[in-house]
């Protein structure tokens, strides 16, 4: 879940 937000960077 949070991992996907890290890919946004």
UniProtKB/Swiss-Prot annotation:
Where in or outside the cell it occurs: the entry states:
Secreted, Cell wall
GO annotations of cellular component type: extracellular region
Q: Give UniProt keywords alphabetically.
A: Cell wall, Secreted
Q: State the name under which the record lists this protein.
A: 58 kDa cell wall protein
The species is Daucus carota
């Amino acid at each position: 879940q949070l991992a996907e937000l890290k890919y946004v960077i």
